[in-house]
Amino acid sequence: MDNNAAKPLVTVLGASGLVGTAITRELASRPIRLRLVGRRPTVVPPDARAEIEVRTLDLAVPGAVAEAIAGADAIVHLVAHISGESTWRVSSDDPIAERVNLGLVHDLVEAVRAERPARPPVVLLAGSMSQAGRSSTARIDGSEPDRPLTTYDRQKLDAELAIQAATDEGLIRGATLRLATLYTQGTDSPALDRGVVCAMMRKALADQPLTMWHDGTVKRDLVCVDDVARAFLAALDQPDATTGRSWLVGTGQATSIADLFTIISKVVAAHTGRAPVPVTSVRPAEHSMPTDLLDFVLDPTAFQDATNWAPQVSLLEGLDQLAAAMVAQTASSPA
């Protein structure tokens, strides 16, 4: 018997990004076959137990998705179109964004349809809590009707619906993890993080004031990417419990932007020995999005109950670890 073939094959699409790198680190410790697919070179963890194959592909090229997922028992789809500094700022007339954020999911479904594996593969899609749009409650719990307010969120919702339709058809065993606001604690390179936390941390390290739009009362649910990686593994391990719907993944804790920026200022000061940089309020920029001034805090209870997953990294701990990592990185960089 071919022992290699007996090991499950997990394919990670978007493995070179922030979430993909964290998931790869977790999966690499398992006795599986692991196919890492990204446009950039993917970091392979040292001392990996998994048999790792790295493929550098532009998945938007016709046929690339089919090549990437061929023979996979499970697929983690993390690819998103990045326009400038943030994935969620997408123009409604950007054909590349629609091709990547939605078209690749259609390619995935059609590739599975053509291959017709004996057992439908598990497919996990990375979504966003902001897909729900404006909520009338303090915390999003998944029962709200989806009314996405941005092009990015509409595309992510359409991708989620395509995964759901393919699951209903019996082609795949799919689920979407709608993620809270992500940040890294520096376990992997902070350069991978394009989010607001790392951006403000860099400004504080440069001794620049931290500017927030409006009065800073907007609240966010902030979750460490290492906890998110563990959430994806929990869903992979329990497909019977998670298949067929979307799940909210976060901490359930509300943090105002003013409090977040103040904490960042203080933890950076603690590591540099300088005075904390000021936190100031400015008018929202012209390129601000409808979601920028809305609260987004979620209730992750359903996912926790289904998988026994729970976040392990507190915000203060994560920010302190990130500050330490970025200070160390700055100190080791050539002058």
What are these regions (language model features)?
Residues 2, 9, 314-335:
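Amphipathic terminal alpha-helices
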Residues 238-288:
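Mid/C-terminal beta-alpha module of Rossmann-like enzyme folds, strongest
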Residues 10-30:
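N-terminal Rossmann NAD(P)H-binding glycine-rich loop of SDR-like oxidoreductase domains
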Residues 52, 57-100:
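NAD(P)H-binding glycine-rich loop region in Rossmannoid oxidoreductase-like domains
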Residues 106-151:
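Conserved Rossmann-fold NAD(P)-dependent oxidoreductase catalytic core, especially the SDR/UDP-sugar
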Residues 132-133, 150-151, 175-194:
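Flexible, glycine-rich beta-alpha linker
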Residues 157, 170, 182-198, 208, ...:
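Glycine/proline-rich active-site loop of Rossmann-fold NAD(P)-dependent oxidoreductases
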Residues 134, 149-175, 205:
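Active-site Tyr-X1-5-Lys
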